[in-house]
């Protein structure tokens, strides 16, 4: 778990990675995301080297996704993460951090929770990456979040976190028999506000006080007829 050795190895091999990146079809890329665990020696040492190299070559912003070790993983992993963050933050445009400990159930080890934590991370990043995508069969939403808005939000830099919440959409025909149109529309707005509140107050990738944030972006995905403007604006 020697992150200095990890950084040295990456410095020696960085040309291999950059060569692979240069051969990818990235003509429509908006940004780079570099993902690594910050507790071990390899990821904690290598991530800042990769981010710094990408920033020197490409104009697009470079974001890091760093996985922080849980408290029960050991002191050396905590020390590696602290050292890694110190070198990482100056080399990337923003750092999205994930606290392994925040996702563990009582008495559970990281190894036992590995798949679930990865799934939660992928779910949040997946919504972020798909923002603004429109397929030929899709209905275009009234308001669309695109890559430029995400980049503008992350422009403040520093440490970032992502929240997530979901709710099943009720079948309209069940409720429309008992509620008038105005009541049904009010219900949609309240549901959106509730989902956003749970995303912010619930399980963030990195627990933090939302009042201390410099900027925030709300992304709501779902059937267009359920995305009530009043609910979104209230959120």
Name every feature range the model reports, one short phrase each.
Residues 1-235:
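Tubulin/FtsZ superfamily GTPase core signature
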């Amino acid at each position: 778990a020697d992150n200095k050795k990890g950084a040295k190895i990456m410095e020696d091999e960085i040309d291999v990675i950059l060569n692979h990146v240069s051969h990818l079809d990235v003509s429509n890329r908006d940004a780079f995301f570099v993902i690594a665990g910050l507790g071990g020696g390899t990821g904690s040492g290598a991530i800042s080297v990769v981010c710094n190299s990408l920033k020197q070559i490409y104009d697009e912003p470079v974001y890091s996704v760093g996985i922080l070790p849980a408290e029960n993983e050991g002191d050396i992993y905590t020390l590696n993460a602290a050292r890694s963050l110190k070198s990482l933050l100056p080399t990337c445009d923003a750092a999205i951090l994930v606290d392994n400990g925040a996702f563990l159930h009582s008495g559970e080890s990281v190894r036992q929770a590995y798949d679930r934590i990865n799934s939660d991370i992928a779910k949040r990043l997946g919504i972020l990456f798909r923002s603004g995508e429109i397929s030929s069969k899709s209905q275009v939403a009234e308001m669309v979040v695109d890559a430029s808005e995400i980049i503008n939000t992350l422009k403040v830099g520093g440490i970032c976190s992502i929240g997530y919440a979901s709710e099943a959409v009720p079948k309209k025909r069940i409720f429309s028999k008992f509620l008038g149109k105005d009541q049904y529309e009010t219900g949609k707005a309240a549901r959106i506000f509730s989902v956003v509140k749970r995303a912010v107050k619930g399980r963030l990738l990195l627990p933090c006080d939302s009042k201390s944030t410099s900027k925030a972006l709300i992304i709501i995905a779902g059937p267009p007829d359920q995305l009530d403007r009043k609910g979104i604006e209230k959120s």
